[in-house]
Regions:
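Flexible, glycine-rich active-site loops centered on histidine and acidic residues
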Residues: 146-180
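Condensing-enzyme catalytic core mediating Claisen C-C bond formation in acyl metabolism
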Residues: 2-66, 169-248, 252
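Buried hydrophobic positions in well-ordered alpha/beta secondary-structure cores of metabolic enzymes
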Residues: 24-26, 52, 81, 92-95, ...
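Acidic, glycine-rich active-site loops and adjacent beta-strand->loop/helix elements
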Residues: 30, 98-103, 129-134, 157-162, ...
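Short glycine-aspartate micro-motif
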Residues: 21-24, 94-96, 151-155
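Glycine-rich phosphate-binding loops at beta-strand->alpha-helix junctions
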Residues: 95-104, 268-283
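Phosphate/pyrophosphate-binding loops at sites that engage ATP/ADP/AMP, CoA/4′-phosphopantetheine
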Residues: 77-93, 252-269
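Conserved catalytic cysteine-centered active-site region
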Residues: 51-72, 100-153, 283
């Protein structure tokens, strides 16, 4: 206790004293049943299966059912991850959901997921970081476990991009699909998650973006004379710009991350890049 003036002591705040290690204890995944071929995509765009495979390496993708939500997909992936981690859902102290396709501004999807899984009153929140969201979630979970805030964190990356894809847009219609991946991060005797390199490029917000803000839909809904003037706020991107950006940036970030971990590329057993498309990965 530190006195500030006679008769008025101020209590000292306490916090966890030891920095622990963390690792991924279990992984889970979910892909919807419906397989969508390039031929089906080409019904709406001027393209071909051969062109799509040549440009992206993509042969098929999965689309969720119309009544299948991001929480439904996240639940399936999470149950698998929790089972593989060998823990009870009640041991999970926090749920992090990475998604940009939960259709509600509020409430977040994470609390509903925690409730479905039988997790009693966890800290639960969504993060909106698009392609980087899952990695952001893993890093946050790692920090939470190491700091002693919680012992186990459920991290889920899930998207239902079929709801926000313009099937008539030749530049993006064949790129996106639906699915979920989950991980349980928990306490470990040895380090299991390496350093994270954070960053963003705010000057490139127009490269991959939502076509219209949600607020632009209100005039069209309230005034019939505006019908047809406002497009559904689907995701669009500048393909060539994204390709160049991803190829050069991802390679440098990988090099910098390896250096931050104080290892070399020869020490790596596997390299798992973001699954954008085969051309980017190969480049």
């Amino acid at each position: 206790v530190t006195p500030t003036r006679p008769g008025r002591p101020v209590p000292t705040l306490t916090s966890p004293q030891t920095l622990r290690h963390a690792r991924i204890l279990g992984l889970g995944g979910y892909r919807p049943e419906r397989v969508v071929t390039n031929e089906e995509i080409c019904r709406y765009i001027d393209s071909s299966d051969e062109w799509i495979q040549q440009r992206s390496g993509i042969v098929t993708r999965r689309f969720a059912r119309p009544d299948e939500t991001v929480v439904d997909m996240a639940e399936a992936a999470s149950r698998q991850a929790i089972d593989r981690a060998g823990i009870d859902p009640g041991q999970i102290g926090a749920v992090i959901m990475a998604t940009v396709t939960h259709p509600y501004q509020t409430p977040a999807a994470a609390p509903e997921l925690g409730h479905r899984l039988g997790i009693p009153d966890p800290a639960a929140f969504d993060i909106s970081a698009a392609c980087a969201g899952y990695c952001h979630g893993i890093s946050l979970a790692n920090d939470m476990v190491r700091a002693g805030t919680v012992d186990h964190v459920l991290v889920v990356g899930v998207e239902k991009l079929s709801d926000f894809t313009d099937k008539h847009d030749r530049g993006s219609a064949f790129i996106f699909g639906d699915g979920a991946g989950a991980a349980v991060v928990g306490v470990s005797d040895t380090p299991g998650i390496g350093p994270t390199l954070w960053g963003s490029l705010g000057d490139k917000t127009d490269v991959i973006t939502q076509r219209e803000p949600w607020t632009e839909l209100r005039p069209a809904m309230e005034d019939p004379s505006h019908h047809g003037e406002i497009a559904w706020p689907s995701f669009v991107m500048q393909g060539q710009t994204v390709f160049r950006w991803a190829v050069f940036s991802m390679a440098q970030v990988a090099i910098d991350t390896v250096a931050a971990a104080r290892i070399t590329t020869e020490d790596l057993d596997a390299f798992v890049p973001h699954q954008a498309n085969m051309r980017i990965t190969d480049a």
